[in-house]
Regions:
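Short, acidic/polar N-cap/turn motifs at the starts of alpha helices
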Residues: 1, 18, 50-52, 89
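Short beta-strand segments
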Residues: 1-35
């Protein structure tokens, strides 16, 4: 579990989301599933507006830049995250028509 610290795109207030993650080399990977809801989670919109954020893993705080994975990279990371989460992301995807984004958090 990691803590993602963003700034609200409208309120400019600090926001924190606790998210499951997988590692990909030095990067951290999170999935904007929102349990298969029809809309993206708020933290995803905040990342799109301001991709330079901070995460906390255990006691370590890390400055990262977020980006949405695409193509082959997305497929590979989706499969890895879904396996770690015991097929839940595939279940969530079956509940919604929106493509669920896979976000890469690259340390700066």
């Amino acid at each position: 579990m990691l803590l993602l610290r963003t700034v609200g795109r409208r309120t400019r207030e600090p926001r924190t989301a606790a998210l499951l993650y997988v590692r990909d080399g030095d990067a951290y990977v999170v999935v904007a599933s929102k349990g298969g809801a029809p809309q993206h989670p708020g933290w995803f919109h905040n990342l799109k507006a301001e991709p330079d954020v901070e995460i906390q893993v255990g006691r370590e705080r890390i400055v990262v830049r977020a980006r949405v994975s695409e193509g082959e990279e997305r497929s590979r990371l989706w499969d890895r995250a879904d396996e770690v989460n015991q097929g839940q992301y595939a279940n969530y995807q079956s509940r919604t028509k929106r493509p669920i984004p896979v976000i890469v958090l690259d340390p700066r």
